[in-house]
């Protein structure tokens, strides 16, 4: 039987050098680590890792080749009260595995035990890691490096974006390949998108609870192998990495960046009753935040929380991020529940992972976007991330909806959000682009549902409609649900236009939810994380071409307005912005706080956004000059010069002089 050589303690994971494979695994509390390899017949062969450098276990298997399937058995104490849950009866996934063979099905054998260990061996059904070789011709690929001030983000799900697209070949719909298909790329280009932000593509598992209900985790925020691509999005699991890189290369050639939504805050092992896949059995005490009683701190709402202040876990997370940039050429990351990244356990801007990213010559050069909260005390950290990060701006989301749909936001508060929420983000040298403005996202109502539903309708999720937020700031305009009279449809359309205009012509970085530009509805489900079906897949055959054209025209208009593209804070008298009332006069303090919802925003001294958010048609006197409405609010031919705009109720228009 072949013996393992000692090998090297770096890099993490399994790496083929042309002669064999070097294996490394971190565990500070293990007493022994077995590498388990499986031949073509499924026969298991075990080898003790002979090298032990600090907390890194390592060994080298001569003559091993790509395609080899493997896992680990890690020996150590079973001491739940101290946070130790070693169980060598369970085959474990390498946290740095690049490919996984097998499915993460609900099975009692994939649990380690709660108070007492479950000593039933699970190698026969446990997923296996696969050694991969990294050969890929990137040709002349180069990152677009779109300036932040010019960035337009489009948030999309790999499968949902293309699964029903009639112009994409059936055999590649819903896959990585479809992202790089000319039809998809041309659509994004015509829309004006500069960055495609993908919901998680790292391999994830469906929670046992969902599997028992016949559902699955659709969004992907339940990671199990952070270096491996989710195989269900590939035409062939064996070529997933190649297909993904082909798509990125094609998108880059079109000048479109790719941003990955990444989940570093928790794992698919969930709470102590959850499955055992990897980290819990490798070194539970190091990888997770552990309470004094040995249970997990659940600061994520998912059962566990990764300890991103532990040096080894920081190294793991940093290596993962570098892998996606260096191996797949991604252009940035959106970090789910990113407050966890700064926990020590209190949130700190100089937390170890933040410092590691800032000091990394690779990671410090890509786009970094935080979802700036978690669910623990002190978890709401909007505006408090280090300067390298942009942040989801929920202040903007709520303000835009309240202003246009609830009519209860003063002009001053609306203007503050329109101006990149400078009261929140103008600190530590940050620029307006740090505010990622959004009206909708994958989590919550779609834009169409915001104007069609007053209440969430999540019954299909199997939780009796208890899940999902009740704070939607939506307005069904008088009838719950889709459809209705022509008048109702038109009023809803006007509200959609107002929200899109506010999003795409505000200072800051706009993020558009895929499907909002053509009227996609989830029928009132505002938490469709487990709906892998026509509720979430974009139905291109029903797309509103008029709304798509409206959205594209707004993005095109945004790119013509210097005040929105220069990415610098607006200052009094700098010519970037003037705030005027319905009579084209500066607003008084009382008008800002208590005045009617009528406002004129003059940008770059040439572009005027006139707003009438009242219930009545109102005359708006435009500033001096020859003004004409511009697309998408008027045709390009035969512009009509006007001095007074008859502002419809809840309406707005953009003029140029």
From Swiss-Prot:
The record marks 443 as: Transition state stabilizer. GO terms for molecular function: glycogen debranching enzyme activity; hydrolase activity, hydrolyzing O-glycosyl compounds. CDD domains: AmyAc_Glg_debranch, E_set_GDE_Isoamylase_N. Keywords: Carbohydrate metabolism, Glycogen metabolism, Glycosidase, Hydrolase. Its EC number is 3.2.1.196. It comes from the Bacteria. SUPFAM superfamilies: (Trans)glycosidases, E set domains. It is an enzyme of class 3 (hydrolase). It catalyses: Hydrolysis of (1->6)-alpha-D-glucosidic linkages to branches with degrees of polymerization of three or four glucose residues in limit dextrin. GO terms for biological process: glycogen catabolic process. The active site is at 336 (nucleophile), 371 (proton donor). Residues 460-479 are annotated as: Disordered. Pathway: Glycan degradation; glycogen degradation. Belongs to the glycosyl hydrolase 13 family. Removes maltotriose and maltotetraose chains that are attached by 1,6-alpha-linkage to the limit dextrin main chain, generating a debranched limit dextrin. This is Glycogen debranching enzyme. The gene is glgX.
């Amino acid at each position: 039987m072949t013996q393992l050589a000692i090998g090297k303690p770096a890099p993490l994971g399994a790496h083929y050098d042309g002669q064999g494979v070097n294996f490394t695994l971190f565990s500070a509390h293990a007493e022994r680590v077995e590498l388990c390899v499986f031949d073509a017949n499924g026969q298991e062969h075990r080898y003790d890792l002979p090298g032990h450098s600090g907390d890194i276990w390592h060994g080298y298997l001569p003559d091993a080749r790509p395609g080899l399937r493997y896992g680990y058995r890690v020996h150590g104490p079973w001491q739940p009260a101290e946070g130790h849950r070693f169980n060598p009866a369970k085959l474990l996934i390498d946290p740095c595995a690049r490919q996984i063979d097998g499915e993460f099905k609900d099975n009692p054998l994939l649990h380690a035990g709660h108070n007492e260990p479950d000593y039933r061996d699970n190698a026969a059904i446990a997923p296996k890691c696969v050694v991969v070789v990294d050969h890929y011709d990137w040709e002349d690929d180069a990152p677009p490096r779109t300036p932040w001030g010019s960035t337009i983000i489009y948030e999309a799900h790999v499968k949902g974006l293309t699964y029903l697209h009639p112009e994409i070949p059936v055999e590649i719909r819903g896959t990585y390949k479809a992202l790089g298909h000319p039809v998809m790329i041309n659509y994004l280009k015509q829309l004006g998108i500069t960055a495609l932000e993908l919901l998680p593509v790292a391999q994830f598992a469906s929670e046992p609870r969902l599997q028992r209900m016949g559902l699955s985790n659709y969004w992907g925020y339940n990671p199990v192998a952070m270096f491996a691509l989710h195989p269900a999005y590939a035409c062939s699991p064996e070529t997933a990495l190649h297909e993904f890189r082909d798509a990125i290369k094609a998108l880059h050639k079109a000048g479109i960046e790719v941003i990955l939504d990444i989940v570093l805050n928790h794992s698919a092992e969930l709470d102590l009753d959850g499955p055992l896949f990897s980290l819990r059995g490798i070194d539970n005490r190091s990888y997770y935040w552990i309470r004094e009683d040995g249970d997990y701190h659940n600061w994520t709402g998912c059962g566990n929380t990764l300890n991103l202040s532990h040096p080894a876990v920081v190294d793991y997370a940093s290596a993962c991020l570098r892998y996606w940039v260096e191996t797949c050429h991604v252009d940035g990351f959106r970090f789910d529940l990113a407050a966890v990244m700064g926990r020590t356990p209190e949130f700190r801007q100089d937390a170890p992972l933040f410092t590691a990213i800032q000091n990394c010559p690779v990671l410090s050069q890509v786009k970094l976007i935080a979802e700036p909260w978690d669910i623990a005390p002190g978890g709401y950290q909007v505006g408090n991330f280090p300067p390298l990060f942009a942040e989801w701006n929920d202040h903007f989301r709520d303000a835009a909806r309240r202003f246009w749909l609830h009519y209860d936001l003063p002009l001053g508060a609306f203007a503050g959000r329109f101006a990149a929420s400078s009261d929140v983000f103008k600190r530590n040298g940050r620029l307006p682009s740090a505010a990622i403005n959004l009206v909708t996202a994958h989590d919550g109502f779609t834009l169409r549902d915001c104007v069609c539903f007053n209440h969430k309708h999540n019954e299909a999720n199997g939780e009796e409609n208890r899940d999902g937020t009740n704070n939607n700031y939506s307005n069904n305009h008088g009838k719950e649900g889709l459809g209705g009279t022509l008048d109702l449809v038109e009023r809803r359309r006007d509200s959609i236009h107002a929200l899109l205009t506010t999003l795409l012509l505000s200072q800051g970085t706009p993020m558009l939810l895929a499907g909002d530009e053509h009227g996609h509805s989830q029928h009132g489900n505002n938490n469709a994380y487990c709906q892998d079906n026509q509720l979430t897949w974009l139905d291109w055959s029903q797309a509103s071409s008029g709304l798509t054209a409206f959205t594209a025209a707004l993005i095109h208009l945004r790119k013509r307005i210097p005040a929105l593209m220069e990415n610098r804070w607006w200052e009094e008298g700098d010519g970037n912005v003037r705030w005027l009332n319905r009579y084209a006069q500066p607003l008084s303090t009382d008008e800002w706080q208590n005045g009617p919802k009528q406002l004129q925003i003059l940008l770059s001294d040439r572009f005027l956004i006139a707003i009438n958010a009242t219930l009545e048609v109102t005359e708006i006197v435009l500033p001096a000059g020859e003004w004409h409405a511009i697309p998408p609010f008027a045709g390009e031919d035969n512009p009509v010069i006007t001095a007074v705009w008859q502002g419809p109720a809840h309406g707005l228009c953009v003029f140029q002089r």
